[in-house]
């Protein structure tokens, strides 16, 4: 009887890892496809610090970065239940964050510090129980890896 429970436990853990890996891979591939021409984008959007500052200081622009879950521009993508871990909704949130990041590429998110700030803020929206609660979908370390912030410092 114990052997059956042990086997069932192993199967459950294995399945959980497979599901998490599948979601992580999907989100990573979405980000990679968005930024496959990242170097071209980086050279195209050479913006002044004045433009960057206006993005971060203008309340309307800042709202996109820090308060997107309340912004109508985001539509249903942040319409997640407080219980979280709804795979379809978590994927929608992930895609919405990627789209926002792409939109701000080279303006608000154009150096290492702003990239880290954006990644941390969006992960809080993605994983926070008061927002989407998608914590079991993607870890914070993976989230940071996807945004590849160190590439901005070179």
Swiss-Prot record:
Pfam families attached to this UniProt entry: Euplotes_phero
GO cellular component terms listed in the entry, alphabetical order: extracellular region
One GO MF term: pheromone activity
Compartments, record wording: Secreted
Alphabetized UniProt keyword annotations: Pheromone, Secreted, Signal
Residue positions assigned to the propeptide: 17-52
Coiled coil feature spans: none
Domain of life: Eukaryota
Signal peptide: 1-16
Function noted in UniProt: Mating ciliate pheromones (or gamones) are diffusible extracellular communication signals that distinguish different intraspecific classes of cells commonly referred to as 'mating types'. They prepare the latter for conjugation by changing their cell surface properties.
The protein's name in its UniProt record: Mating pheromone 2
Organism: Euplotoides octocarinatus
């Amino acid at each position: 009887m114990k052997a059956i429970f042990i086997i069932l436990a192993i199967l459950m853990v294995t399945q959980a890892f497979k599901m998490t890996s599948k979601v992580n891979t999907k989100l990573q591939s979405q980000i990679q496809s968005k930024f496959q021409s990242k170097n071209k984008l980086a050279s195209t959007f050479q913006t002044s610090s004045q433009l960057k500052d206006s993005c971060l200081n203008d309340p309307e622009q800042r709202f996109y970065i820090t308060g997107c879950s309340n912004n109508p521009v985001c539509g249903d993508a942040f319409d997640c239940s407080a219980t979280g871990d709804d795979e379809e909704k978590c994927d929608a949130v992930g895609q919405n964050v990627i789209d926002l990041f792409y939109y701000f590429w080279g303006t608000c998110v154009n150096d290492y510090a702003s990239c880290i700030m954006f990644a941390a803020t969006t992960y809080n929206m993605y994983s926070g129980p008061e927002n989407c609660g998608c914590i079991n979908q993607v870890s914070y370390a993976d989230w940071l890896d996807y945004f590849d912030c160190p590439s901005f410092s070179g």
